[in-house]
């Protein structure tokens, strides 16, 4: 196994536009795999990454959504082999630690969330600049905006290759986060639960689709972009609120108007905007309401309205929608193949080559944009 020279998207400092340049990708070490990325996609978290989220470690190779094939495996890897189609992720699952066995969380203690170091689990990087040899941090330890990447084998999920690979890229973070939150976190009741989804991007549409699959009959979508109405309805949304069209009422007031003054059982906050968190919480029922936050932002803190909490509502943050990468993600792929999850192809609105990555960031601002597919 040799060092590979390939193209990747590198951000050299917070606030600087990313650039496509040649990097060096080392062979996998023990317990690791090297993946040839075929498709990647753009998530709002990647925008935040250019600003230093979740920690300002630069230079970094961007990207955390993608799908590819195993190019080679390191010593001790038995579950994967060359040619396997895989999704690289930022979570692991050992199946044996206290958290994995509890059934209450998807955050494995043995293979933890790789969000804060920018390095492999052993504390080093497999990527460096082809120009000056500088070490490059790996965003969320997977860096999918690179023709090749190296990750710990436990963070790579082998998937059924029958699924269209662009769709698999969409399932590697955003859509699955929303869908998983309805399935793994919310404990929705078929025919009785009411749901609101704040923000109808890929995460929000995943939550809408998940609520539909769970049998929810009232699914309220909330977005300031009217173009999202049609997309939300395609995934199962039953009501739509554009808060900008009724400036005299808050989001929670508008939600309660649609729920006989009660609010919803569960509100999924998919924007990461701190000012909307309290509105999402206040949109839920007193005593039993549950607000699940899925969005991310650059702010380090937020203020929660204590009065809303006095109503005995529950507030929880969810990473990857509570989905366990090895146990649950293959099941979501299967749900797509058997058409239990429908219309996932409608997430795709734009497509660019890796060399046009900065155009992808501009496309994300378009009112009709949901997912930008990146072809490598």
Curated annotation (Swiss-Prot):
<feature type="binding site">
    <location>
        <position position="64"/>
    </location>
    <ligand>
        <name>Zn(2+) 1</name>
    </ligand>
</feature>
<feature type="binding site">
    <location>
        <position position="97"/>
    </location>
    <ligand>
        <name>Zn(2+) 2</name>
    </ligand>
</feature>
<feature type="binding site">
    <location>
        <position position="100"/>
    </location>
    <ligand>
        <name>Zn(2+) 2</name>
    </ligand>
</feature>
<feature type="binding site">
    <location>
        <position position="45"/>
    </location>
    <ligand>
        <name>Zn(2+) 1</name>
    </ligand>
</feature>
<feature type="binding site">
    <location>
        <position position="320"/>
    </location>
    <ligand>
        <name>NAD(+)</name>
    </ligand>
</feature>
<dbReference type="InterPro" id="IPR013149">
    <property type="entry name" value="ADH-like_C"/>
</dbReference>
<dbReference type="InterPro" id="IPR036291">
    <property type="entry name" value="NAD(P)-bd_dom_sf"/>
</dbReference>
<feature type="binding site">
    <location>
        <position position="228"/>
    </location>
    <ligand>
        <name>NAD(+)</name>
    </ligand>
</feature>
<comment type="similarity">
    <text>Belongs to the zinc-containing alcohol dehydrogenase family. Class-III subfamily.</text>
</comment>
<feature type="binding site">
    <location>
        <position position="173"/>
    </location>
    <ligand>
        <name>Zn(2+) 1</name>
    </ligand>
</feature>
<protein>
    <recommendedName>
        <fullName>CYP enzymes assisting alcohol dehydrogenase</fullName>
        <ecNumber>1.1.1.-</ecNumber>
    </recommendedName>
</protein>
<feature type="binding site">
    <location>
        <position position="64"/>
    </location>
    <ligand>
        <name>substrate</name>
    </ligand>
</feature>
<dbReference type="InterPro" id="IPR013154">
    <property type="entry name" value="ADH-like_N"/>
</dbReference>
<dbReference type="GO" id="GO:0008270">
    <property type="term" value="F:zinc ion binding"/>
</dbReference>
<dbReference type="Pfam" id="PF00107">
    <property type="entry name" value="ADH_zinc_N"/>
</dbReference>
<feature type="binding site">
    <location>
        <begin position="294"/>
        <end position="296"/>
    </location>
    <ligand>
        <name>NAD(+)</name>
    </ligand>
</feature>
<feature type="binding site">
    <location>
        <position position="45"/>
    </location>
    <ligand>
        <name>substrate</name>
    </ligand>
</feature>
<feature type="binding site">
    <location>
        <position position="45"/>
    </location>
    <ligand>
        <name>NAD(+)</name>
    </ligand>
</feature>
<dbReference type="GO" id="GO:0009820">
    <property type="term" value="P:alkaloid metabolic process"/>
</dbReference>
<dbReference type="GO" id="GO:0005829">
    <property type="term" value="C:cytosol"/>
</dbReference>
<keyword id="KW-0017">Alkaloid metabolism</keyword>
<feature type="binding site">
    <location>
        <position position="223"/>
    </location>
    <ligand>
        <name>NAD(+)</name>
    </ligand>
</feature>
<keyword id="KW-0862">Zinc</keyword>
<keyword id="KW-0479">Metal-binding</keyword>
<dbReference type="Pfam" id="PF08240">
    <property type="entry name" value="ADH_N"/>
</dbReference>
<comment type="subunit">
    <text>Homodimer.</text>
</comment>
<dbReference type="GO" id="GO:0046294">
    <property type="term" value="P:formaldehyde catabolic process"/>
</dbReference>
<comment type="pathway">
    <text>Alkaloid biosynthesis.</text>
</comment>
<dbReference type="InterPro" id="IPR011032">
    <property type="entry name" value="GroES-like_sf"/>
</dbReference>
<keyword id="KW-0520">NAD</keyword>
<dbReference type="InterPro" id="IPR002328">
    <property type="entry name" value="ADH_Zn_CS"/>
</dbReference>
<feature type="binding site">
    <location>
        <begin position="199"/>
        <end position="204"/>
    </location>
    <ligand>
        <name>NAD(+)</name>
    </ligand>
</feature>
<feature type="binding site">
    <location>
        <position position="94"/>
    </location>
    <ligand>
        <name>Zn(2+) 2</name>
    </ligand>
</feature>
<feature type="binding site">
    <location>
        <position position="371"/>
    </location>
    <ligand>
        <name>NAD(+)</name>
    </ligand>
</feature>
<keyword id="KW-0560">Oxidoreductase</keyword>
<dbReference type="GO" id="GO:0051903">
    <property type="term" value="F:S-(hydroxymethyl)glutathione dehydrogenase [NAD(P)+] activity"/>
</dbReference>
<feature type="binding site">
    <location>
        <position position="108"/>
    </location>
    <ligand>
        <name>Zn(2+) 2</name>
    </ligand>
</feature>
<feature type="binding site">
    <location>
        <position position="43"/>
    </location>
    <ligand>
        <name>Zn(2+) 1</name>
    </ligand>
</feature>
<comment type="function">
    <text>May be a positive catalyzer of strictosidine production by assisting secologanin biosynthesis, thus being involved in monoterpene indole alkaloids accumulation.</text>
</comment>
<dbReference type="InterPro" id="IPR020843">
    <property type="entry name" value="PKS_ER"/>
</dbReference>
């Amino acid at each position: 196994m040799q060092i590979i020279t390939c193209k990747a998207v590198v951000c050299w400092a917070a606030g600087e536009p990313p650039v496509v340049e040649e990097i060096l990708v080392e062979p996998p070490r023990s317990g690791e795999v090297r993946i040839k990325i075929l498709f990647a996609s753009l998530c709002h978290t990647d925008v935040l990454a250019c600003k230093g989220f979740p920690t300002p470690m630069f230079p970094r190779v961007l990207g955390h959504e993608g799908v590819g094939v195993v190019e080679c495996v390191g010593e001790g890897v038995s579950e994967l082999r060359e040619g396997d189609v895989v999704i690289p992720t930022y979570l692991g699952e050992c199946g044996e630690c206290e958290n994995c066995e509890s059934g209450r969380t998807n955050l494995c203690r043995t293979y933890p969330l790789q969000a804060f170091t920018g390095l492999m689990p052993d504390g080093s990087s497999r990527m460096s600049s082809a120009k000056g040899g500088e070490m490059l941090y790996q965003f969320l330890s997977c860096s999918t905006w690179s023709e090749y990447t190296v990750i710990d084998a436990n963070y790579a999920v082998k998937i059924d290759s029958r699924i269209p690979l662009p769709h698999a890229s969409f399932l590697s973070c955003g859509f699955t986060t929303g869908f998983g939150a309805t399935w793994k976190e919310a404990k929705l009741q078929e025919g009785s639960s009411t749901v609101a989804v704040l923000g109808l991007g890929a995460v929000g549409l995943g939550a809408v689709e998940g609520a539909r699959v769970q049998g929810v009959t009232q699914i309220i979508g909330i977005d300031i972009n009217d173009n999202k109405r049609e997309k939300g309805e395609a995934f199962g949304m039953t009501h739509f609120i554009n808060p900008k069209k009724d400036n005299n009422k808050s989001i929670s007031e508008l939600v309660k108007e649609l729920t006989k003054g009660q609010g919803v059982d569960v509100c999924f906050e998919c924007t990461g905007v701190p000012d909307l968190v309290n509105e999402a919480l206040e949109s839920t029922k007193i005593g039993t309401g549950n607000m699940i936050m899925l969005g991310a932002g650059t702010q380090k803190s937020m203020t929660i309205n204590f009065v809303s909490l006095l109503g005995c509502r529950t507030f929880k943050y969810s990473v990857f929608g509570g989905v366990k990468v090895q146990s649950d993600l293959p099941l979501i792929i299967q749900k797509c193949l058997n058409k239990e999850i429908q219309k996932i192809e409608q997430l795709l609105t734009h497509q660019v080559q890796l060399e046009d990555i900065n155009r992808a960031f501009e496309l994300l601002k378009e009112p009709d944009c949901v997912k930008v597919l990146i072809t490598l």
